Each structure stands twice: as C-alpha cells, then as structure tokens.
C-alpha cells in the first residue's frame, strides 16, 4: 500500500517503486515524520546486520544484489572479533584494515575485503523513489515484499534503539492501517486504527487486540 506504482527493468534486473506520501506515527497515533524511501534502505541494512540476528535474512541475501556478500563479510568479521571457531575447525582472523581471513581445517584460506552497504542493491533515489536490484529475474519478488525483511522502519529510531528497536510500543513507529499502541511480550499487543493512513476511511475496525496462548 505504500507504493502508487512500480516498474521492472529486465536489462538491469531493477524494480523501481514510486511511493505515496505517508507518515510514521508513534504509539499514541501522533505523527513523527514522513515515510521516505530511505526508511526502506535503513530497514534492509538493519536486517543485514548480523548483530541483530534476523531469522529471515535469507529472504534478502538470496535475491537482492550484493546482500549476501555484505552480510557474510560482517558475519566473518564478527567471528574474527569474538574468536569463533566453527565445529569443523574453521577459524577467522581480521587485520587492521578489516580484511578477514577464513581458514578451514585443512589450512585452505580465503580472504574477504570490507564491503560497503552502497554495494547492496537497494537505493533511495529520492524521498519517494525506491529501487531494488536483484541477482536474477524473479517474478515472485513483488510477493516477497510482503514479508517482514522488506518492511520499512523509521531510520532515526533504528539508530537510537538498535537491538531494542520494536521491543515495546514506545520503541516502535507504524505507517500502516493500524499502529502499535500497547505491547507486553508474551502477553498481548494492541493495535489501533491509524487516522494518518492514506486509506483510513476504508478501515472500519478501531482496535485489534492479540492475546498470547500461554499453553505449551
């Protein structure tokens, strides 16, 4: 619902999305800031940051150009910095310039130079134009965008809360038909109608409450 139109360029394997004007709201339904293409970029960078342990990062690395190389480099760098040794004996070391050497148990070594996020195939062309460049022609990409790794997130909030982002209603922002008003982990969360949403007149439910089933 955040895009008004989109185009596919088969020659460059690039999807271009033209975004509508929409706002982020906080847990009280108050406007925080406009939604921009950069929010999609920031969110994807968050997903591709190993420190945040995204469980579905594979939905990005498999399809978005450069995403796998970027993610793997930072996995290897983290392993080097924390002294990880894999079960098969693989070790990781990093030099002062950030070049990581991955050495297998048979002493075979591969090196990986630092990877900049600019090499990942997601770009904010301007505030309302977003592009994704893929590894290959994948007709199902539009459906893939409904999955969590491709959702936008308010960049300044990601930066402020890091791994605590969206762990409470106070650390979240919403831009859909409903906003997160209350959240108690493993108990319940409450969504309320977002009056700022472009299609608010078509939403006839004011409050949705989810309650966890504590039974094992």
Language-model features: locations:
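Short, polar/charged alpha-helical segment
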Residues: 1, 6, 191-192
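Conserved positions in beta-strands of structured domains
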Residues: 4-7, 123, 179-181
